[in-house]
Amino acid sequence: PRFEDVPAAVEKRIVEDVENVFYPTKPVVPFLDIVHDRAVLELFRGCTRGCRFCQAGMLYRPVREKTPERLLQIAKDTIANTGYNEISLMSLSSADYSKLPELVDMLMEEFKDKQVSVSLPSLRIDSFSIDIAKKVQQVRKSGLTFAPEAGTQRMRDVINKGVSEEDLLAACTNAFKSGWNTVKLYFMMGLPTETDEDLAGIADLAYKVLDLHRDITGKRNGSVTVSVSFFVPKTHSPYQWYGQQDVEEIHRKQRYLKSLINNRNISYHYHDGYTGYMEAAFARGDRRLSKVLVKAWEAGCKFDGWTEFFNYETWLKAFADCGLDPAYFARRTRDFDEPLPWDHLDCTVSKAFLKREWEQAVDANLTSDCRRGPCKGCNVCPELNTAIIDYKEGGRVEKVTFGLK
């Protein structure tokens, strides 16, 4: 620290009682259309599924749920104040909310005569409920989105996704039998230990889902959208030490996967490799990159999250003008003992736990969810003197865990 009154490490703070925390039920409603033009209902905070690529799953631990009654009141107030006609149930893994069936019933009953729909984000395959999906589609029908994340079981185990091909096909079977014809699948490319066989598994899964629709319905009007993002290693996650793959290699993989998908009923979308490269540089960068941001802005970089505004050469020049190389931050695999630029930001998940998870990933071993199972020793609960709050057994359950340094 540069000043005596500044602590060496800044520890995160959390809201222990999410039930009674302030919630913005009177948001500003713009006159023009925006991306998330709907009411948002936060079911709970935190996620302990333990996906190794996920920064948010580490940062926002532990899980703390709200009651259905509190959520219903928030929804009623927000709709009354905004006039929105859609409520999105948002959390890191919304389908894991212990009282989701009860909440959906309450929302549908409350808004059945007001043409207010309820929507769910992309769903975990292993917590998907066709009954809930059918209920939320009563007002406004849409496609279903699942997130297998990887094409082979080995790769899904590496990232600790904890779902199988059988889980995906079972979920799609239920969906197709219930009248859905469209499914969207989310994947990532460039993950640690990934091979071309794992990429081929993405195409293979897409074809299996499409064939499943034809077998169940006897029709050829099914469609599958395959959306593949470029993996960006994030701080405070087990992959914070991992160097991102070269952009040229990612482009090769994108072409390879595209060559395997030759069906008009399968749409293939992928993210720009150069944008992902810049994201990785800033995701694992240090304070020197603040000068790069200023240089890029002075050179005209604005709204660069949109590909039509993104100018890769301008960003490279901004780095060069500051005497820096983005590859140093994005592509370099760091040593376990190396001090990290973000070590002074303490999210209370111990570095020892993240190292163990990296080692588990290399061996393709799964780590189970501590939400309703044994503690995995991430250190969050004892460090913050807090507990997991879950309503699965009916009433409020506060599960206290321990830490392993």
Functional labels for PLM-detected ranges:
Residues 1-56, 61-63, 69, 305-345, ...:
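Acidic, low-complexity intrinsically disordered segments
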Residues 3-13, 63-67, 74, 94, ...:
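Terminal amphipathic helices with adjacent charged low-complexity linkers/tails
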Residues 26-28, 45-49, 58-61, 78, ...:
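Short, glycine-/Ser/Thr-/acidic-enriched flexible segments
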Residues 30-31, 66-76, 80, 103, ...:
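Ferredoxin-type iron-sulfur electron-transfer modules in oxidoreductases and energy-metabolism complexes
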Residues 36-40, 52-62, 84-92, 151-158, ...:
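Glycine- and acidic
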Residues 49, 98, 128-132, 154-159, ...:
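Flexible glycine/acidic-rich beta-alpha junction loops that bind and position SAM and/or redox cofactors
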Residues 54, 334-404:
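Cysteine-cluster motifs in flexible loop/terminal segments that predominantly coordinate metals
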Residues 77-225, 229:
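Conserved SAM/AdoMet-binding glycine-rich loop
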